[in-house]
Curated annotation (Swiss-Prot):
Protein name from the UniProt record: Phosphatidylinositol transfer protein CSR1
Described function: Non-classical phosphatidylinositol (PtdIns) transfer protein (PITP), which exhibits PtdIns-binding/transfer activity in the absence of detectable PtdCho-binding/transfer activity. May also regulate post-Golgi membrane-trafficking events and have a role resistance to oxidative stress.
Matches recorded under SMART domains: CRAL_TRIO_N, SEC14
MF-aspect GO terms: phosphatidylinositol transfer activity
Family that this chain belongs to: Belongs to the PITP family.
């Protein structure tokens, strides 16, 4: 089906929403050490961030310092890459390890700076660009902004929490790039067992064209794996589901099949972890969550769980009992046969990838060529974003916004080329259901 971008995306912004997005980029560029004149978009409550002075300024940024707001000096400085995406972090000055930048704090964003004080701008910048799959940079940021109801300060703090988590705790890039074979090679038996059971499978698409994650809680027993292995398995599934997202679809549907569920399967720890992930680190990624065929023992459990949920997430949850209920949202051809649908897929048929499809993982020359192209697109995107922020008329702003969208498409297409060089082929790649 033909899809159009939903409200609050870069393709559909109102004038006020566009201003908030500009403010987000100004604050990010400030932390990355990129010069931009944000005076036209920052309000009285949000004074323009002052750039850090001296050597500290030089330590920040994905593509080096920007020497002025416009002109040749800026373009020249953009040509000097300071930290490469997916590569080891690099900085311009040899004394980088001795001195970390201390950006001037902006009123209302003190918590953000506190959260990121142990990280430098290059690390945060690198993580931002590497967490993109086929999504657009602006739309990734807008997830956090929408989740915080367009409150710039709350959105920036949420983003800071999530970036720090990705760098220091969750490390989802390591998990998804290593894939199922990564868990097997690391001898993480609990993760391997969950994969072999087919506890959660990305399969099919709903009526909006968004991927479905089919979960069978009856297969879960807490003793089969550690809590850490359950969390890592959950992150693997979430990140693999992200690979199925293609603009303008930016959410996934989760179908919890509770047939056969008993108290022996109940485990509150992973439920809490998933709630935290979706609310704090993957905002606006959940489209709909179906709890299907809940047994009579489930209401007391639900009474506990619903108190942990943010109202926005809770509003996306629906209880269903029949295939007809599901067919309001999911085509019959995409509903598992065992639930009364027409999809005859074998959900017990997981096969561990043997690595034979990972032919490009060792091709450093090919990877370098695609990364060089990616760096160039990102540099052009940053320049276009600065011109968009600094534009002095609605017409000029619209022109640069359109340019940003075009470059976002290029970046998305580039990731499709880059993916086999950095990510081990998953079960979904091998069986042909995933086409990044």
């Amino acid at each position: 089906m033909t899809q159009t971008a939903a409200p609050g995306r870069v393709q559909t912004l109102t004038k006020e929403q566009e201003k908030v997005l500009k403010q987000v980029w100004v604050h990010l560029f400030q932390f990355w050490g990129i010069d931009v004149d944000g005076s036209a978009v920052l309000t009285a409550k949000e004074p323009e961030p002052a750039a850090p002075s001296g050597k500290g300024r030089k330590l920040l940024g994905l593509f080096g310092k920007r020497k002025d707001a416009t002109g040749a000096a800026r373009k020249e400085s953009n040509g000097k890459a300071a930290a490469k995406v997916y590569d080891a972090e690099k900085v311009e000055d040899s004394d980088a390890e001795k001195e970390k930048p201390t950006p001037q704090k902006v009123e209302g964003l003190e918590e953000m700076y506190e959260l990121l004080k142990e990280l430098d701008g290059a690390a945060v910048s690198k993580e931002f660009w590497s967490m993109l799959r086929c999504d657009y940079p602006d739309n990734l940021l807008l997830r956090f902004v929408r989740a915080r109801k367009w409150d710039i300060n709350k959105a920036m703090i949420m983003m800071a929490h999530s970036l720090r988590w990705r760098l220091n705790e969750g490390k989802p890039e390591d998990i998804v790039f290593g894939g199922e074979r990564g868990a097997q090679k690391a001898d993480k038996k609990g993760i391997v067992k969950q994969l072999e059971l087919g506890k959660a499978t990305v399969r099919g698409f709903d009526k909006n064209g968004c991927p479905i994650v089919y979960v069978r809680p009856r297969l879960h027993h807490a003793a089969d794996q550690t809590e850490a292995e359950t969390s890592e398995y959950s992150l693997l599934i979430i990140e693999q589901a992200r690979l199925f997202l293609k603009e303008p679809c930016d959410t996934a549907t989760i179908l919890f099949d509770l047939s056969g569920f008993s108290m022996a399967n109940m485990d509150y720890a992973p439920v809490k972890f998933l709630i935290t992930c979706f609310e704090a680190h993957y905002p606006e990624c959940l489209g709909k969550l179906f709890i299907h065929k809940a047994p009579w023992i489930f209401p007391p459990i639900w009474n506990i769980i619903k108190n942990w949920l943010d109202p926005v997430v809770a509003a996306k949850i629906a209880f269903t009992k029949t295939a007809a209920d599901l067919e309001e949202f999911i085509p019959a051809e995409q509903i598992p046969l065992e639930l009364g649908g027409k999809d005859e897929y074998n959900f017990d048929g997981f096969v561990m990838p043997d690595g034979s499809a990972d032919t490009k993982l060792s091709d450093e020359k090919g990877k370098a060529a695609v990364l060089e192209e990616r760096e160039a697109i990102i540099k052009r995107f940053i320049d276009a974003t600065i011109s968009w922020i600094e534009s002095t008329s609605d017409e000029e702003s619209a022109k640069w916004l359109e340019k940003k969208i075009d470059l976002s498409k290029e970046l998305s297409e580039n990731y499709s080329k880059l993916d086999p060089y950095i990510r081990s082929r998953s079960f979904y790649d091998v069986n042909g259901t995933l086409k990044v």
